[in-house]
């Protein structure tokens, strides 16, 4: 009979680590992701239609074709701003969690 090393019952090489202690961190990450997902969908679309009808056509008096063009540019800029904000928040959240974990 072979003599095996005594190991923990659940320790399998290559098994997934136990993340049950990080539930608060996981919830925080999911809330951030959900917030920016909703913002990424609603802000550019809402900004496009609002700026087209209220800003460019009603206030500035642009034609319909011109207002389509400028409203699309504004919506694309909004997408880039939301993406930049997401990267900034995710970067800072990750470094904060890394610092807190390193101090343990």
UniProtKB/Swiss-Prot annotation:
InterPro entries: Vma21. It is found in: Endoplasmic reticulum membrane; Endoplasmic reticulum-Golgi intermediate compartment membrane; Cytoplasmic vesicle, COPII-coated vesicle membrane. Residues 1-21 are annotated as: Disordered. Pfam families: VMA21. It is a multi-pass membrane protein. Residues 1-28, 90-104 are cytoplasmic. Residues 50-68 are lumenal. The chain crosses the membrane at residues 29-49, 69-89. One of its GO terms (biological process) is vacuolar proton-transporting V-type ATPase complex assembly. The keyword Repeat does not apply. The keyword Chloroplast does not apply. GO terms for cellular component: endoplasmic reticulum membrane; endoplasmic reticulum-Golgi intermediate compartment membrane; ER to Golgi transport vesicle membrane. Keywords: Cytoplasmic vesicle, Endoplasmic reticulum, Membrane, Transmembrane, Transmembrane helix. Required for the assembly of the V0 complex of the vacuolar ATPase (V-ATPase) in the endoplasmic reticulum. Belongs to the VMA21 family. This is Vacuolar ATPase assembly integral membrane protein vma21.
């Amino acid at each position: 009979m072979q003599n095996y090393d005594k190991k923990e019952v659940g320790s399998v090489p290559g098994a997934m680590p136990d993340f049950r202690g990080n539930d608060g961190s996981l919830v925080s990450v999911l809330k951030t992701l959900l917030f920016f997902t909703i913002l990424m969908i609603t802000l550019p679309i809402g900004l496009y239609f609002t700026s087209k009808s209220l800003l460019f056509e009603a206030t500035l008096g642009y034609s319909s074709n011109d207002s389509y063009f400028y409203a699309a540019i504004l919506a694309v800029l909004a997408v880039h701003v939301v993406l930049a904000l997401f990267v900034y928040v995710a970067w800072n959240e990750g470094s904060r969690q890394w610092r807190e974990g390193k101090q343990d």
